[in-house]
Amino acid sequence: METKEEKKERRQGYFARLKKKRQAKQNTETVSANSPGSPVSKTPAEKDDESKVILEQISSSGDNCKFAGEKETVPEKEKRKKKYNQLKDIRRTELKRYYSTDDNQNKTNEKKEKKMVSQKPHGTIEYTAGNQDTINSIALKFNITPNKLVELNKLFTHTIVPGQILFVPETSVARLPSFSPGAPISPSSSDAEYDKLPDADLARKAFKPVERVLSSTSEEDEPVVVKFLKMNCRYFTDGKGVVGGVMIVTPNNIMFDPHKSDPLVIENGCEEYGLICPMEEVVSIALYNDISHMKIKDALPSDIPKDLCPLYRPGEWEDLSSEKDINPFSKFKSLSKEKRQQNGDSPNVPGAKQINPSDKEKSADFEVLQSSESTGSIKSKSLEFYNNITATEHLEKFAADPHVKEPSEEKNVSDIRTKEDSLSGGGDDFIDLEKVPSPMDRGLDRKISLMEGLLADPRELGRTKQQVTKPTTEVQEHFTVDSLEKKDSVEPKADLDLELCEKQDVIPEVNKCVSSPTGKVETALDTKKELEKDKLIEFYLNKDGSGSQSSEDLHKAEIQKGENNKAIGIDLTLSCSKSQADEVHTVKSMELDSCCVGRKAASLESSAAAAEEKDLKESLDSSLVPAVDKTCQETQLDNQSEVRLWLLQKIQVPIEDMLPSKEEKSKTPPMFLCIKVGKPMRKSFVSQSTTVSQQYSKKIKQPEYWFAVPREIITVEEAKRRKSVCSYYGEEDDDDALPVLKHHSALLENMHIEQLARRLPARVQGYPWRLAYSTLEHGTSLKTLYRKSASLDSPVLLVIKDMDNQIFGAYATHPFRFSDHYYGTGETFLYTFSPNFKVFKWSGENTYFINGDMTSLELGGGGGRFGLWLDADLYHGRSNSCSTFNNDILSKKEDFIIQDVEVWTFE
């Protein structure tokens, strides 16, 4: 029995040891589980279930114990209680661990989600990079810069890998569908509406290139602020005309696009005139008031000698729009290429060139003006015209006489004709000639009818004969040239002479004092120009020689009266007394009336002219030959000296008189912009290869490009401000309105303010004037002036009054300050009211505008002289003529003593 009991105890000891080990193991786990958090509280139902399970286990273990041992002792009960408690604790720890692990996982997931949400920027969506995607392509697709995309995704490099998730702006994705795989893009409201359409599926299957589509609610519908200049201008090409267009200046390029409506663009195409130039190639840019610095072909009209025009200001530069006056020289009526060929290569057919009716009247007016300057009355004008006709007709008859002509004369006269034609620029006339089959001179019948009553009065003929001084001089000139043309049959030269006669502005008088050699030279020069006038008459009569002779008897009685006075032609041709202005206008109206009559009866006029031509040749046969023989040797001069005298006389005429247009100069002429570049500008409408081959071949010097630009360029904000001001004042003319002065001025009166306000730049007009410094309030110190001007950020107006009570000063684009060098812009100017108001603007020679230091304030300089100089105490001042403004002395004396100083700003 004892052995069996010992075995039982041994078995219990074994299980007891196992339980102890298990219990110790569980205790360590409970300690570790209890440490992170408090025990989990449980409901009473859960506690009952757990206790039931534990009791069942205990009962089963108790049965085993009973089976093992028959009687239970007291220590065994205590052990059972301990086991029960231990099992209960184990169960609690397992449940606690279960619930605690779930909570920890949820918390970590929540933290990850919160972290993901915080990393995603607001207003962005995820985009998965594809195989062909780069940072630049993605940025371009979503309208964002690459640097902004890198900053948005907090990337360290610009390198991405396929499948990488990036954040992109959501607004761009709503407008642009992504084509990369795996991009989690949710359809926007616009896409949802698009899906409701019946053909949405078909539309989505259609291939569409990737492009930007601006929605109505997009932020990019708002105008983007880009700094650029856009202005209408004219481009002076080098030998290809002057073209109007638009110049666009950006921070990177300078571009010029010609107007498609420009005549030269229509004729030659836009390829010749479109320009583009990078800013890196620009060497210098300068603005000039005139085009005297221009050294290209199209600086002046082609018919004016370039060396005779050091300064030329074109008139009527009203605006630079594409619709009005595109060509700046459009007022000069230049011939086209076809008309120039007609003038140069006209056929040798009599009557081939005529003047059209509108230009006929102009030539008639010109002809009457010529005759009016050489006669004393309306009657003498008519007689001169009539006798010129008789003289030239008889000279044609004498042209066949071989004893009178000399070969040297023919050569000399032909040289004179060719040189004069080359100097006169016959290729570019301002009166257009056309081939119109006109029968004869329109005003001939009217002139003959006027002379019918004049020839009957012998007293008038006696007066005109007394005016003759050297009759044979001009007759010899008529004879030599007429005989030369009769021999060589040079009809096109008559056409050119007609154009030359119509172009002449100055009709000389015959010099009556011909005793000295200079007098002879002047006489020859005058008779040479009178010859041009007679050539005009001869041209009309020669081309009508084939007219009908049916009306010869109608004018026979009138011509017989002319035969009784054979020397009248010579007498009246050289009459040179000045006429009055009212007589000129009277004859003009008569000539215009004769033109109208001539159009109605062309056939009658032609027959009358033919009859008159025949009889007048017979009337002066015997009277002209002796006079021609006597003075043939006296009138021959050196050809070179004659041409030189003619050229000198042309040079002495003012340049304004040489121009066809004598209009009043424009009040706002343009500025001339000169752009010097390192390489020639590329043509924007020509392919790259041809552009390089055409333009980069000449690298002799830096190319220059000239443009006529507006004098005033304003910003869009300034244009809006002006528009608002105009709308505020309505239709009232506010040009005379005085600006608002916030403070009272001790120096400026209303007259001064009004005149100054008109000359101020546009960007300060309309702003009120505020007094920034005054010697009466702040004392006489230049340092105080600097201190008061330090806080200003706008142009200032300096007003000075000296001890002579003279008011003058300057407008400065920048407030006065200490500086180591000159500053300011070309808007700076000097002005004076001594004695009259004058403004001296920038001359363009240098940029010495404003300079301030501790000892003085200087405005304008050059050559050691200052336009305006003030000392540190604002007591002494000096004014000299400087090259910056080309100004006069502003005060009465160069050195002056300052009485008061005011500085006004515009705010």
Swiss-Prot record:
One of its GO terms (cellular component) is nucleus. It is found in: Nucleus. Residues 25-41 have a biased composition (Polar residues). Residues 125-168 form the LysM domain. SMART domains: LysM, TLDc. One of its GO terms (molecular function) is transcription coactivator activity. Residues 1-29 form a coiled coil. CDD domains: LysM. InterPro entries: LysM_dom, LysM_dom_sf, TLDc_dom. Residues 1-51, 63-83, 99-121, 335-373, 401-443 are annotated as: Disordered. One of its GO terms (biological process) is regulation of transcription by RNA polymerase II. Keywords: Activator, Coiled coil, Nucleus, Transcription, Transcription regulation. Residues 746-907 form the TLDc domain. Belongs to the OXR1 family. Enhances the transcriptional activities of several nuclear receptors. This is Nuclear receptor coactivator 7. It comes from Gallus gallus. The gene is NCOA7.
